[in-house]
Protein backbone atom coordinates (compact mmCIF):
# COMPACT_ATOMS: atom_id res chain seq x y z
CA UNK A 1 0.00 0.00 0.00
CA UNK A 2 1.11 3.58 -0.50
CA UNK A 3 0.20 6.68 1.50
CA UNK A 4 1.10 10.36 1.65
CA UNK A 5 -0.35 13.69 2.82
CA UNK A 6 -3.94 12.91 1.60
CA UNK A 7 -4.08 10.08 4.16
CA UNK A 8 -3.10 12.27 7.11
CA UNK A 9 -6.55 11.93 8.71
CA UNK A 10 -7.40 8.50 7.36
CA UNK A 11 -7.16 5.30 9.41
CA UNK A 12 -4.33 3.15 8.12
CA UNK A 13 -4.78 -0.61 7.79
CA UNK A 14 -2.68 -3.21 9.54
CA UNK A 15 -0.79 -6.27 8.31
CA UNK A 16 0.10 -4.88 4.88
CA UNK A 17 3.07 -6.73 3.39
CA UNK A 18 4.93 -3.53 2.49
CA UNK A 19 4.27 0.21 2.28
CA UNK A 20 5.46 3.19 0.24
CA UNK A 21 5.33 6.62 1.91
CA UNK A 22 5.26 9.94 0.08
CA UNK A 23 7.89 12.42 1.24
CA UNK A 24 6.30 15.54 -0.28
CA UNK A 25 3.17 17.50 0.48
CA UNK A 26 0.72 18.81 -2.09
CA UNK A 27 3.61 20.30 -4.08
CA UNK A 28 7.09 18.88 -4.73
CA UNK A 29 8.77 21.61 -2.66
CA UNK A 30 6.59 20.98 0.41
CA UNK A 31 6.78 18.52 3.31
CA UNK A 32 4.37 15.70 4.05
CA UNK A 33 3.22 16.81 7.50
CA UNK A 34 2.33 13.23 8.44
CA UNK A 35 5.65 11.74 7.37
CA UNK A 36 6.77 10.66 10.84
CA UNK A 37 3.50 8.91 11.65
CA UNK A 38 3.26 7.25 8.25
CA UNK A 39 6.84 6.02 8.40
CA UNK A 40 6.11 4.51 11.82
CA UNK A 41 3.07 2.77 10.33
CA UNK A 42 5.08 1.50 7.36
CA UNK A 43 7.79 0.15 9.66
CA UNK A 44 5.19 -2.19 11.18
CA UNK A 45 4.49 -3.82 7.80
CA UNK A 46 4.18 -7.58 8.04
CA UNK A 47 6.63 -8.43 5.27
CA UNK A 48 6.38 -11.71 3.43
CA UNK A 49 7.20 -10.40 -0.06
CA UNK A 50 10.43 -9.67 -1.89
CA UNK A 51 9.73 -5.94 -1.51
CA UNK A 52 11.44 -3.87 1.21
CA UNK A 53 8.87 -3.35 3.97
CA UNK A 54 9.24 0.45 3.88
CA UNK A 55 9.90 2.47 0.73
CA UNK A 56 9.63 6.18 -0.16
CA UNK A 57 8.46 8.22 -3.11
CA UNK A 58 9.09 11.83 -4.14
CA UNK A 59 7.39 14.03 -6.72
CA UNK A 60 8.88 15.16 -10.03
CA UNK A 61 8.34 18.66 -11.39
CA UNK A 62 9.84 21.05 -13.92
CA UNK A 63 8.21 24.51 -13.83
CA UNK A 64 10.78 26.11 -16.12
CA UNK A 65 10.39 29.88 -16.29
CA UNK A 66 6.83 29.89 -14.91
CA UNK A 67 6.65 33.12 -12.86
CA UNK A 68 4.83 31.23 -10.12
CA UNK A 69 7.85 29.00 -9.51
CA UNK A 70 9.60 29.73 -6.22
CA UNK A 71 13.00 28.79 -7.60
CA UNK A 72 14.78 28.43 -10.92
CA UNK A 73 18.58 28.08 -11.05
CA UNK A 74 20.96 30.59 -12.55
CA UNK A 75 24.17 28.57 -12.12
CA UNK A 76 25.35 24.99 -11.74
CA UNK A 77 25.72 25.37 -7.98
CA UNK A 78 23.02 24.56 -5.45
CA UNK A 79 23.52 25.05 -1.71
CA UNK A 80 27.27 25.21 -2.20
CA UNK A 81 27.42 22.00 -4.25
CA UNK A 82 28.24 21.91 -7.96
CA UNK A 83 27.18 18.51 -9.32
CA UNK A 84 28.57 17.11 -12.54
CA UNK A 85 26.20 18.31 -15.27
CA UNK A 86 26.47 16.57 -18.63
CA UNK A 87 24.20 19.20 -20.18
CA UNK A 88 26.69 22.01 -19.74
CA UNK A 89 26.44 25.29 -17.85
CA UNK A 90 23.28 26.79 -16.39
CA UNK A 91 23.34 30.58 -16.48
CA UNK A 92 21.52 33.74 -17.43
CA UNK A 93 21.35 35.75 -20.65
CA UNK A 94 20.99 39.50 -20.44
CA UNK A 95 20.29 39.09 -16.73
CA UNK A 96 17.32 36.80 -17.42
CA UNK A 97 16.90 33.18 -16.33
CA UNK A 98 17.12 30.58 -19.08
CA UNK A 99 15.22 27.39 -19.78
CA UNK A 100 18.06 25.11 -20.85
CA UNK A 101 18.82 21.44 -20.33
CA UNK A 102 21.60 22.41 -17.94
CA UNK A 103 19.24 24.53 -15.82
CA UNK A 104 16.55 21.85 -15.86
CA UNK A 105 19.15 19.41 -14.54
CA UNK A 106 20.07 21.76 -11.69
CA UNK A 107 16.40 22.33 -10.85
CA UNK A 108 15.85 18.57 -10.65
CA UNK A 109 18.97 18.29 -8.52
CA UNK A 110 17.53 20.86 -6.10
CA UNK A 111 14.34 18.81 -5.71
CA UNK A 112 16.16 15.53 -5.11
CA UNK A 113 18.73 17.01 -2.76
CA UNK A 114 16.08 18.77 -0.66
CA UNK A 115 13.95 15.62 -0.54
CA UNK A 116 16.83 13.81 1.11
CA UNK A 117 18.21 16.55 3.34
CA UNK A 118 15.35 18.75 4.60
CA UNK A 119 12.12 16.72 4.49
CA UNK A 120 12.78 14.76 7.65
CA UNK A 121 14.21 11.48 6.35
CA UNK A 122 16.80 9.86 8.59
CA UNK A 123 19.14 7.28 7.08
CA UNK A 124 18.07 7.84 3.44
CA UNK A 125 20.28 4.99 2.25
CA UNK A 126 18.10 2.57 4.21
CA UNK A 127 15.22 2.93 1.74
CA UNK A 128 14.34 2.29 -1.87
CA UNK A 129 13.19 5.60 -3.38
CA UNK A 130 10.78 6.19 -6.26
CA UNK A 131 10.34 9.32 -8.40
CA UNK A 132 6.66 9.98 -9.06
CA UNK A 133 6.17 11.25 -12.64
CA UNK A 134 2.65 12.50 -13.36
CA UNK A 135 0.96 15.01 -15.65
CA UNK A 136 -0.77 16.89 -12.81
CA UNK A 137 2.58 18.34 -11.68
CA UNK A 138 4.55 20.95 -13.62
CA UNK A 139 6.47 19.72 -16.65
CA UNK A 140 7.71 21.08 -19.94
CA UNK A 141 6.33 20.31 -23.41
CA UNK A 142 9.88 19.43 -24.48
CA UNK A 143 10.56 15.93 -23.15
CA UNK A 144 14.31 16.60 -23.28
CA UNK A 145 13.88 19.26 -20.57
CA UNK A 146 11.98 16.84 -18.35
CA UNK A 147 14.53 14.07 -18.85
CA UNK A 148 17.28 16.48 -17.83
CA UNK A 149 15.36 17.42 -14.67
CA UNK A 150 14.77 13.75 -13.88
CA UNK A 151 18.47 13.03 -14.24
CA UNK A 152 19.11 15.95 -11.90
CA UNK A 153 16.70 14.52 -9.34
CA UNK A 154 18.56 11.23 -9.38
CA UNK A 155 21.86 13.07 -8.93
CA UNK A 156 20.42 15.07 -6.04
CA UNK A 157 19.04 11.99 -4.31
CA UNK A 158 22.37 10.22 -4.70
CA UNK A 159 24.23 13.24 -3.34
CA UNK A 160 22.12 12.93 -0.21
CA UNK A 161 23.03 9.26 0.23
CA UNK A 162 20.26 7.41 -1.63
CA UNK A 163 21.41 4.24 -3.34
CA UNK A 164 18.34 2.67 -4.98
CA UNK A 165 16.04 4.81 -7.16
CA UNK A 166 13.15 3.74 -9.39
CA UNK A 167 10.47 5.40 -11.50
CA UNK A 168 6.71 5.56 -10.84
CA UNK A 169 4.33 6.46 -13.67
CA UNK A 170 1.94 5.11 -16.27
CA UNK A 171 3.18 4.33 -19.80
CA UNK A 172 1.14 7.18 -21.30
CA UNK A 173 2.24 9.79 -18.76
CA UNK A 174 5.85 8.68 -19.01
CA UNK A 175 5.73 8.97 -22.81
CA UNK A 176 4.29 12.50 -22.62
CA UNK A 177 6.69 13.75 -19.97
CA UNK A 178 9.93 11.85 -20.59
CA UNK A 179 9.56 10.55 -24.12
CA UNK A 180 12.18 8.10 -25.34
CA UNK A 181 15.08 7.44 -22.97
CA UNK A 182 18.45 6.58 -24.45
CA UNK A 183 20.86 4.07 -23.02
CA UNK A 184 23.27 6.92 -22.24
CA UNK A 185 20.82 8.32 -19.66
CA UNK A 186 20.88 7.40 -15.97
CA UNK A 187 17.10 7.02 -16.32
CA UNK A 188 17.57 3.96 -18.50
CA UNK A 189 17.19 0.52 -16.91
CA UNK A 190 15.71 1.65 -13.58
CA UNK A 191 13.08 -0.37 -11.75
CA UNK A 192 9.50 0.60 -12.52
CA UNK A 193 6.46 1.01 -10.30
CA UNK A 194 3.52 1.08 -12.72
CA UNK A 195 0.14 2.69 -11.95
CA UNK A 196 -2.70 0.62 -13.42
CA UNK A 197 -5.72 2.66 -12.31
CA UNK A 198 -8.98 0.95 -11.38
CA UNK A 199 -8.35 -2.74 -11.81
CA UNK A 200 -8.01 -6.07 -10.04
CA UNK A 201 -5.16 -7.92 -8.40
CA UNK A 202 -5.25 -10.49 -11.21
CA UNK A 203 -4.80 -7.79 -13.86
CA UNK A 204 -2.10 -6.15 -11.77
CA UNK A 205 -0.14 -9.38 -11.73
CA UNK A 206 -0.55 -9.67 -15.48
CA UNK A 207 0.75 -6.10 -15.86
CA UNK A 208 4.00 -7.20 -14.22
CA UNK A 209 4.90 -8.70 -17.61
CA UNK A 210 4.04 -5.59 -19.64
CA UNK A 211 6.58 -3.33 -21.36
CA UNK A 212 8.66 -1.34 -18.84
CA UNK A 213 8.98 2.44 -19.02
CA UNK A 214 12.65 2.84 -19.88
CA UNK A 215 14.45 -0.43 -20.27
CA UNK A 216 14.10 -1.48 -16.64
CA UNK A 217 12.01 -4.13 -14.93
CA UNK A 218 8.56 -3.72 -13.41
CA UNK A 219 8.90 -4.26 -9.67
CA UNK A 220 5.41 -3.24 -8.54
CA UNK A 221 1.97 -2.43 -9.94
CA UNK A 222 -0.41 -0.01 -8.22
CA UNK A 223 -4.20 -0.41 -8.14
CA UNK A 224 -6.20 2.78 -7.66
CA UNK A 225 -7.81 3.34 -4.26
CA UNK A 226 -11.32 3.05 -5.70
CA UNK A 227 -10.82 -0.71 -5.84
CA UNK A 228 -11.76 -2.13 -2.46
CA UNK A 229 -9.48 -0.18 -0.14
CA UNK A 230 -11.10 3.19 0.61
CA UNK A 231 -8.64 6.02 0.19
CA UNK A 232 -5.45 3.96 0.08
CA UNK A 233 -3.95 2.55 -3.11
CA UNK A 234 -2.92 -1.08 -3.16
CA UNK A 235 0.33 -2.34 -4.63
CA UNK A 236 1.17 -5.75 -6.02
CA UNK A 237 4.74 -6.99 -5.98
CA UNK A 238 6.14 -8.36 -9.24
CA UNK A 239 9.21 -9.94 -7.66
List the predicted regions and their residue ranges.
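Conserved residues at the C-terminal ends of beta-strands
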Residues: 22, 168, 223
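Structural recognition of alpha->loop->beta junctions
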Residues: 77-81, 95, 109-128, 178-217
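Functionally critical loop-and-helix segments that line ligand-binding/catalytic clefts
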Residues: 1-13, 184-239
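Glycine-rich, charge-decorated loop segments at or immediately adjacent to ligand/cofactor-binding or catalytic sites
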Residues: 64-72, 173-184
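Aromatic-lined carbohydrate-recognition surfaces of secreted/lumenal glycan-active proteins
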Residues: 56-57, 157-179, 190-199
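Substrate-binding cleft of extracellular glycoside hydrolase catalytic domains
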Residues: 1-149, 159-160
Amino acid sequence: MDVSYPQCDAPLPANEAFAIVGVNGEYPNEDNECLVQELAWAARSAGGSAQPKTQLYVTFANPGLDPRAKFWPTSNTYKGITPSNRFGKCGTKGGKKQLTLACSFVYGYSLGYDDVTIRGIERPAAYRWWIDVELNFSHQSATSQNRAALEGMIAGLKAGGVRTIGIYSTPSQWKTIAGSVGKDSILYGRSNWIALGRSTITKARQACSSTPLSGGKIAMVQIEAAYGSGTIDRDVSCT
